[in-house]
């Protein structure tokens, strides 16, 4: 097998290339447009579900951006053993949203006030992050269960998110406007523009395809009256990080639940970093790959420690950006530095970041549907790289069946205890846990003929 597995896309700027400032800026803005709303959404969802004050919710949003900027800087620059050295963007981990809501709602029903709820949720998040730090040092020993089979599930589970946004998002479902002509029309317009610009021969136009598509969709949304500016009217002018703003408290019961999600997030990080390495034309096996995995997971843990301390939900590497890399052809980690600085600035000045939250879901969905599909393709490539023997076929089929099945109807396991249900309702967790268990249970000697031969050259993957 070749040392480096190509992603099947033409890179304009490879990992160590230094793009001119204007091209780096376009690339950074493209990545920001892909992640900004998903980055701030978890804080908004948790704030609304727990009925937190507007001030607290705004602070959570700002700290999510600042922590993401710090984490991205660590990942792309790779200080010593910390960081993947890839264009790995950090953002809030959606896996924690339902857990935080469940734990916070339980405390709220018991009469705890907002400050104590936040101190407890952030406290267990702070301690739990050290589990990820520890896991980074034993990744080689977890190789039997954390495999490319597990990694490939990540991208495949994201397509539903893009489609829902394409139709207007969850808010549109609640209001009864989901899938109306306005949402579908705007989403389709963005999709067509992004595809069109990605077919251009001009590298600059190709790099800016997603950003241009979103701008065109935003203008169309303004004309249709779909843009709501109410969320930016009462935001403060500037926000400064305040470590342990709500104090620090700890619950061992909550730690067990949050700690489990943290350990499962290692699966997600391994998959995201593997996909990033692949689309960046770096090895997905061997010493360099293992070093990047260790550094990336270690950075995930350390950044979540920082995030929890300043008041953000836990962070992880973001899979969405792998689709941006593949579509734009920009894998330079130096673009990541620009992204990191911009995220910190957006966090310090929430009025600037608030503007991006006004982008309608349908506009984002038009671009994300294509990006998530590209991520799914990268995941499939990861799965088939080493070939699928009969044992691996059973593992892939079962884990994908349960993982994707849960994404279609998360309530299928609702009869289970709440502490278990919050794990298996997540497609990545459900599919990942299934793959892990089958990797442990199925005998290693059960390896018959290849059902799908492995890819051994870049040409075969194109």
PLM feature segments, named:
Residues 1-26, 231-242, 278-288, 292-295, ...:
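Intrinsically disordered, low-complexity non-transmembrane regions of multi-pass membrane transporters
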Residues 2-7, 39-43, 47, 189-200, ...:
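Juxtamembrane interface elements at the cytosolic ends of transmembrane helices
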Residues 2-88, 95-108, 137:
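N-terminal signal-anchor module of multipass membrane proteins
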Residues 9-10, 14-18, 193-196, 210-261, ...:
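Hydrophobic transmembrane alpha-helices of multi-pass solute/ion transporters
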Residues 21, 47-66, 70-85, 260-333:
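Membrane-embedded helical hairpins/re-entrant loop segments and their flanking transmembrane helices
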Residues 22-34, 179-191, 208-209, 223-224, ...:
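Hydrophobic, membrane-embedded alpha-helices of multi-pass small-molecule transporters
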Residues 59-60, 81-96, 144-151, 205-212, ...:
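Short, non-helical or kinked segments that cap or interrupt transmembrane helices
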Residues 105-228, 338-452:
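Membrane-embedded alpha-helical modules
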